[in-house]
Amino acid sequence: LIGLQEGVLSPHNRYSCNKGYRAGGVKMGCHEHRSPLDLDYAIATSCNAYFANVFRNILENKKYKSPKEGYEAWRNYAESFGFGTQLGVDILGERKGVVKHRDYYDKIYRRSWNALTVLSVSIGQGEILATTLQLANFAAIIANRGYYYTPHIIKGIEGQDSIDIKYRTPHYTPVDRAHFETIIKGMWRGVNRDGTCQLARLEGLDVCGKTGTAQNPLGDDHSTFISFAPGNN
């Protein structure tokens, strides 16, 4: 989404996988996907190499003075999606998750870092932590084509008119609606054609989904999955 909005990616851009991404001594593993992949297929098959390329292009965008400035722009988009911040749900102790500011990397690497240094962030690993609520909320943003409502815990709804306006105020992201259609197409393919989400396929219901991996420092990694249906509404 960020790459599309920033103009460094189009749905037709193709990148090779070859079991991962390698550049400047940095290696990121992946499955051996049919190459080259376009965006649609990369989303459906969850190709690490593809999104590593996109992330690097965002940070190295010539409109920014440095990859550090590009990273901070990327981070601002991520925060608009609800990551690295509290969503405001009605439960005490809501976690913010983690999306580091550039100052963190400046301190760790003494200001000597670039896109390759933080490449693991491109696939949601490294210095990234997200709550399940944030992931569900992001699925809602995609389904809504660019906005979300603050999630709340409710007992019941008596009618549309009974809901206070403050609970019906949408929060918009800076990404154009058209770009979400591109992502939804890939998420639909992931479930209904040749992607990683085929177990979620339901006859007669256009389920859209995306798989992920949550790293576990104490044992096996965990699978994650977000989805919504039907895709067109």
Describe each model-derived feature in a short phrase.
Residues 2-233:
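Beta-lactam-recognizing serine transpeptidase/beta-lactamase-like catalytic domain environment
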